[in-house]
A protein has these predicted regions:
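Extended redox/cofactor-interaction regions of prokaryotic respiratory oxidoreductases
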Residues: 1-34, 39-41, 145, 149-163, ...
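Glycine/threonine-rich phosphate-binding loop and adjacent beta-strand/alpha-helix elements that clamp
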Residues: 5, 490-495, 500-523, 860, ...
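Short, polar loop motifs at secondary-structure junctions
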Residues: 46-52, 466-469
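Long, well-ordered, tryptophan-enriched scaffold segments
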Residues: 54-55, 59-277, 366, 374, ...
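Short beta-alpha connecting loops at secondary-structure transitions
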Residues: 55-63, 472-474, 496, 513-524
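A glycine-rich phosphate-binding loop feature that marks nucleotide/adenosyl-phosphate handling sites
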Residues: 92-96, 269-270, 288-290, 320-331, ...
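Phosphate/diphosphate-binding loops
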Residues: 463-469, 473-476, 484, 522-538, ...
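Long, contiguous, secondary-structure-rich segments that constitute the structural scaffold
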Residues: 532-586, 690-695, 699-702, 710-716, ...
């Protein structure tokens, strides 16, 4: 989350899509209810099913699974055409005014510029080099006026842009310069400054080419060309406007199935917070895995971020783009590098070309890219400090400046090692073994049949879990005969683990809060806590290297393991190690008179060094366990601001700030957009930023410095346009159909799917079509009464919901003669799922591009091991036997939502 659970109570407007918090996050859902009760906030819910969350909505819209970008793109188009945008914010806090390189092409045919048939060359996905190319005398703000008097659903707001392009004309400018302020707060600094970049002369020639020789990798220009009037046809804003002019209410209806009048109600309601230029109100967007689990999931979230940027909702109390994490510690697992392509703190993994630490730092450390008159904190410029400190935490005294802090010990990945690709390589015989800790890979899927067959080809499998589950017992999957079992040569080791109540440690919630938890009961029998199991394995492996040698043992032998109890490290010790400590006496220019002595805990990541004098396991968590104690254990209930900040409860990364990018909660002069929800502000007397929250900003940067509020971006501003390699599939989001779809993409039928989505090609990776009889859209979901695949082993949960079912529309059931409770067989091109029919009016038929289309929903919580499974009272069919192994090219998440099935009576 950019904000946090409690902050939702501060909002005036909520859009919940891709999530069902009333059922899946019932404790957290109290905060949307608080906002409705105490702020009269409005709630819009968009979902394939009418859920418990939808019962609380002021407006509910049923959407076809996998069409969220079309809906959100329609909202962007509506906001622009009706002049409901945050004008000052847009110009000064986003890259809307930046000029994009000549040669960049929007995907009117489904492809951005640079596509070679397999991937994108991204040279044109960049900014133009230069200076101010707009009018030399510009006002602080730019007012928005529609390009024509037509309604948002009329031809001239969408088709005209395309006609202009066909005729070779420049798109009509959507902005006109105005001299009057557009918000109730002053929009220019009180002292010595204009709006960012105002009035400066143009810089060097736009688009100047480099000299001959080998073409270097494209980089962001140091001095970006810009136009504060936003009239330049290649300004990010004009390209944004052109991109989403195609997303008319008519097109939204064709793709999503949402009737135009209902879409316009949602668009009118959500953008009403910016009616008449008002900047006091804030709106939030809340989502969960219903957005992430698509072959374009990252771009769905990007579309929401763009919408929030043009509405000025990011960095503000009651605003943001807020992810509801699906497990209690998914956030912490990601923060600590629990995926293949990052280290803790979101540091990048080295590549084979990173021959030394300096080369790695040069590749991964961004340099500022902005108009020369603006300023950018560019906090990722500290990457060398973060990386050196991380290496010191790994290798201790053996990591020195002279040996690059043992950088050469790190693995250099030469291809993708995502979850789905790992299983694909196991199926092809390349991966020989798997350690599965608290992870039921067969049930999780996708394409569970392929995962089962992959495990049959492995040499060994180690499973640490609480119960017998599908992965540990893949060999007894339904359909496996005794003779086939005998032919399986995989050795399976089962290790009894400890449940969450049987071990201490931390949870990091969706709001980025680190909170310490204590042991309630000891693990039963031979069960052991995770760190003891991992420690025993590591120490035995190290012993084998010490006694028997082996290929390149140095990384294992040099690893620092200086815990008081090596066989069972204290997690308090580990937490302190992650926070970091000084390895020599430290001082900071910004904190004169303060010295951190060697051996002391670091007070925060500002103290990290690149010279080997600091050690830190995760720079984001630095400050969580200081000399003052375990900040994550704090339970202070003081909330002086009333905004739900609770600064003395736990620890929120980074730096205990609760709302990220909170400089954007103020105007250019440093005054809050809304004085009733004051987060941070500029204090002229003190010469620094102060507030109820920790300023997410360079604390002494004056408003007149024109420093952008988005300090983690090289540009210093929010990215409406995502340049270069920021995204694999386009600098703007575009609607693509799921890999299995009932229709061709109405925007560009010749390019229906994401052209760079990863699709697998083994004999078990089959895709279905409507012509093959797979004519129903299926989505998966979770129930309040169950927790993934654990609780099917708990009698109380099983009593509440004992067996799998299929949520089927009443109209479809009537057409097929299906009655409630009747057993159904749901088939995809990959497998079958057996469950009883739950005939419901919560899912209705939809008109998709003129064709009547049905959707169904199935919960994910069952398989072939569990209480009811062992009693043979279920179909023994995991839901992910149905789902396809096709993944998002950015986050590598499989497409568990929106695939095609057919329905038969079992």
């Amino acid at each position: 989350m950019t904000n946090g659970w409690i902050d939702i109570k501060n909002t005036d407007m909520m859009l919940i899509m891709g999530g069902n918090p009333a059922e899946n996050h019932p404790c957290g859902f109290k905060w949307p209810v608080e906002a409705k009760l105490h702020r009269n906030a409005k709630l819009i819910v968009v979902d394939p099913r009418f859920t418990r969350t939808a019962t609380q909505a002021d407006l509910f819209l049923q959407i076809r699974a996998g069409t969220d970008i079309a809906f959100l793109g329609g909202l962007i188009n509506y906001a622009i055409q009706t002049n409901r945008i945050a004008k000052d914010y847009l110009i000064n806090y986003t890259n809307a005014a930046f000029i994009v390189k000549e040669g960049f092409k929007l995907p009117e045919d489904g492809l951005f510029s640079g596509f070679d048939g397999h991937t994108y060359a991204k040279d044109t996905w960049n900014y133009e080099e230069g200076g101010n190319v707009g009018p030399k005398t510009q006002s602080t703000t730019a007012g928005v006026a529609p390009t024509s008097p037509s309604t948002p659903s009329g031809k001239s707001s969408s088709e005209t842009a395309g006609e202009q392009k066909k005729q070779g004309e420049q798109p009509a400018a959507n902005f006109e310069r105005k001299s009057e302020p557009v918000s109730s707060q002053p929009s220019t600094p009180q002292k010595g400054g204009d709006a960012m970049g105002q009035g400066h002369q143009a810089g060097g020639p736009v688009g100047a080419a480099g000299q001959g020789g080998q073409k270097p990798p494209p980089m962001l220009p140091a001095n970006v060309s810009y136009d504060l009037s936003l009239q330049h046809p290649r300004s990010v804003f004009q390209l944004l406007k052109q991109q989403y002019s195609r997303y008319t209410p008519e097109m939204v209806e064709r793709i999503t199935g949402i009737p135009q009048d209902q879409f316009l109600k949602a668009a009118e309601l959500f953008t009403s917070i910016r009616k008449d230029g008002d900047m006091k109100k804030a709106g939030t967007i809340i989502y969960a895995v219903g957005w992430t689990q698509h072959t374009f999931g990252t771009q769905i979230i990007r579309t929401a971020a763009i919408l929030q940027l043009i509405l000025g909702n990011v960095g503000r109390a009651g605003g943001g783009v807020n992810a509801l994490r699906g497990h209690s510690n998914i956030q912490g697992a990601t923060d600590m590098g629990g995926v293949f392509d990052i280290f803790p703190g979101y540091l990048k993994i080295p590549q084979p070309t990173d021959t030394d630490l300096a080369t790695f730092n040069k590749r991964t450390t961004p340099t500022s890219s902005k108009p020369s008159e603006w300023d950018s904190y560019n906090y990722w410029s500290n990457t060398p400090k973060f990386m050196a400190s991380f290496l010191k935490s790994l290798y201790g005294d053996s990591a020195t400046k002279e040996n690059d802090f043992n950088f050469h010990y790190l693995p250099k990945i030469d291809r993708k090692f995502s979850w789905t690709e790992m299983w694909d390589e196991m199926y092809s015989g390349k991966v020989k073994g798997l350690f599965a800790f608290g992870m039921n890979g067969v049930a999780i899927g996708p394409n569970s049949r392929k995962n089962i067959e992959a495990l049959k080809k492995a040499d060994f499998l180690v499973v640490c879990d609480l119960f017998p589950e599908e992965t540990a017992e893949f060999w007894r999957a339904p359909g496996t005969t005794p003779e086939q079992m005998k032919s399986i040569n995989t050795t399976v080791y089962r290790l009894p683990g400890a449940g969450f109540a049987e071990k201490d440690g931390t949870f990091v919630n969706s709001a980025r809060w680190l909170q310490w938890k204590y042991v309630a009961v000891p693990p039963p029998g031979d069960a052991k806590v995770d760190q003891e199991i991992l420690a025993r394995i590591f120490l035995k492996v190290r012993e084998l290297y010490q006694t028997q040698g082996g290929k390149f043992p140095d990384p294992i032998l040099s690893l620092s393991w200086s815990y008081t109890t090596p066989l069972n490290p204290s997690l308090a010790e580990v937490a302190k190690e992650i926070n970091g400590k000084a390895l020599a006496d430290l001082t900071l220019d910004t904190q004169p008179g303060v010295t951190i002595k060697a051996g002391q805990q670091l007070p925060g990541f500002a103290w990290l060094k690149d010279d080997g004098t600091t050690s830190c396991g995760n720079w984001l968590y630095s400050g969580s366990w200081t000399e003052a104690g375990a900040q994550m254990q704090r339970r202070g209930t003081e909330d002086p601001s009333g905004l739900g900040i609770y600064p003395n409860w736990g620890y929120s990364w980074p730096a205990n700030r609760r709302v990220m990018y909170n400089r954007a909660s103020c105007d250019l002069a440093g005054k809050p957009w809304d004085n009733e929800r004051r987060q941070v502000w500029w204090n002229e007397m003190q010469g620094k930023w102060v507030g109820n929250d920790v300023p997410d900003f360079k604390v002494d940067s004056k408003p007149s410095d024109h420093m952008g509020p988005f300090i983690m971006n090289a540009e210093g501003v929010g990215r409406i346009f995502g340049p270069l390699a920021a995204f694999a599939d386009g600098p703007f989001p575009e609607h693509y159909e799921p890999v299995e779809s009932p229709i061709a993409n109405p925007l560009h039928p010749q390019q229906s799917n994401n052209p760079v989505a990863r699709k697998f090609t083994s004999d078990l990776d089959k895709l279905g079509t409507v012509d093959q009889g797979f004519n129903v859209v299926c989505t998966t979901y979770r129930l309040t009464e169950h927790y993934h695949y654990w609780t099917k082993n708990n009698p109380m949960n099983v009593q509440l919901v004992p067996e799998p079912f299929v949520e089927i529309p009443a109209q479809l059931a009537n057409e097929m003669g299906i009655t409630g409770g009747e057993k159904l067989k749901i088939s995809s091109a990959r497998g079958q799922y057996i469950g009883k029919a739950m005939v419901t009016k919560r899912i209705k038929p939809m008109m998709i591009d003129g064709k009547k289309t049905y959707q169904i929903g199935i919960p994910i919580h069952w398989g072939y091991r569990g209480i009811k499974e062992d009693e043979h009272e279920t179909g023994l069919t995991p839901a992910n036997l149905l789902s396809p192994a096709a993944i998002d090219p950015n986050a590598y998440t499989p497409e568990f939502k929106g695939f095609l099935v057919k329905i038969e009576k079992a």
